[in-house]
Amino acid sequence: MSDQPVNTPELRPVLPFSFARAQQILLLQDESVTVAEVVCVPDTPALALLEARRVAGVPLAVSQVSPEEFERQLVMRYQRDSEEARRLMEDIGNDIDFYTLAEELPDSDDLLDGEDDAPIIRLINAMLTEAIKHKASDIHIETFERHLLIRFRIDGVLREILRPQRQLASLLVSRIKVMAKLDIAEKRVPQDGRMALRIGGRAIDVRVSTLPSNYGERVVLRLLDKNSVRLDLEALGMAEHNRRQLDTLIHRPHGIILVTGPTGSGKSTTLYAALSRLNSAERNIMTVEDPIEYELEGIGQTQVNPKVDMTFARGLRAILRQDPDVVLVGEIRDGETAQIAVQASLTGHLVLSTLHTNSALGALSRLQDMGIEPFLLSTSLLGVLAQRLVRTLCPSCRQPYVINDEQAQQTGLAAGTTLYHPGGCEKCNYSGYRGRTGIHELLLIDDTVRTAIHHGESELGIARMLGDKRITIRQDGLDKVLAGVTTWEEVVRVTKEE
């Protein structure tokens, strides 16, 4: 007997997972069933060893290991289905009824208790298919004391989809963790992973995040449908004057262009659209991202990795030694990255990046708070695009109405103006909205603004100086309200800070 882990990957576990875990015994056999090995702990019952001998039908080679090593072996061996599950999901069809499957699943305490994991795999297939059908960006699987809740984020808003059996929580979470190659035995710490799937012929990238909670693990799946996004400036919903000005900015030879907004406001899509416009054989375009969301042909993309100290700052330094013309930094999070980005722009590079600020003018204050001197900021910054995403009205069921005096006062429009509000039909799943579009504010750093920044003018001072020349996000949104693209309530929802 030894305490060394068995290292025979060609052997597969034979006993049901529930028995193996309860009795702390692993029976491993090859396809020819001529070789049988047992991995157990010193306290494994003799009856369990006899049962393993009976099932194997051949002599056993027994290895004793520590409880910790046994747990590791157990998880590793019973993750046998990870590749099989991936193959099962290689091309998920559209004929699976998510709701019926959830009702029909048998009760079970653990994903691997039975011989067949197919029902839970089918449920996950159906859940993913349903999410893609509704163009959901995220799936939330949340465990509470008395129920399990599945919600989809559709057009930026969470919607409850299903409340399946509470007992399904561990099955769903465990299977998803297996598919994302996470540690199913570790439930005390958050884990992150990803998987690539094909659903209805579409390539879907899924980012998986787990988080321990008081009633079990919560899981969020971020879905990235690589076929659904048009990476060009014309598809962003920009007003024509903003699009033309941004197009001019990104063709400047050097300087910094920033895109600001909260998480989920479409900043990455805007930057990728800009890179797609610039992408040519005459330019060396390089990125450092967290993570790489879209793979762009002809562009060198690097992903940050904190585990090996591959930060934005370190990646940016390395990129600048690769003779780039255009550099994309996924996000400026700290003063070090900001300083390197500014220096890069001053030495002949065009730098594109994002900041988490609510407005375009807020980017000026944020960079100065990070230690960028006003004279450097005024010299390097070309422009700042602030943006939000609003839901667009379903054109099949939107309904016109005439605003009253109170609504006129709220919107600043004339009483009697015709606007639209959501209806509800089969095409929009009775929500009244279908898809999203951007609303924007583009701050151009012209000579007037540059001088104000250089002299340390405040954010409020620059706003007053610009006056009516500044078209805010809310004003841009109001133009889309007048055009019947969205509603005033949607614009207010995403611009409350203004």
From Swiss-Prot:
Asked whether the keyword Nuclease is assigned, the reply is: no
Q: Which SUPFAM superfamilies match?
A: EspE N-terminal domain-like, P-loop containing nucleoside triphosphate hydrolases
In the UniProt record, does the keyword Signal occur?
A: no
Q: Where mainly found?
A: membrane
| Cofactor(s) of this protein | Zn(2+)
Q: Where in the cell is it found?
A: Cell inner membrane
| Keywords assigned | ATP-binding, Cell inner membrane, Cell membrane, Membrane, Metal-binding, Nucleotide-binding, Protein transport, Translocase, Transport, Zinc
Give GO cellular component annotations, separated by semicolons: plasma membrane; type II protein secretion system complex
Catalyses which reaction?
ATP + H2O + cellular proteinSide 1 = ADP + phosphate + cellular proteinSide 2
Biological process annotations from GO: protein processing; protein secretion by the type II secretion system
Q: Which domain of life is it from?
A: Bacteria
Q: Which residues form a coiled coil?
A: none
Q: Which family does it belong to?
A: Belongs to the GSP E family.
How this chain assembles, per its entry, is: Forms homooligomers; most probably hexamers. Interacts with OutL/GspL.
Q: What does this protein do?
A: ATPase component of the type II secretion system required for the energy-dependent secretion of extracellular factors such as proteases and toxins from the periplasm. Acts as a molecular motor to provide the energy that is required for assembly of the pseudopilus and the extrusion of substrates generated in the cytoplasm.
The record's section on NCBIfam families has: type_II_gspE
User: What name is this protein filed under?
Assistant: Type II secretion system protein E
Please give the organism: Dickeya dadantii (strain 3937)
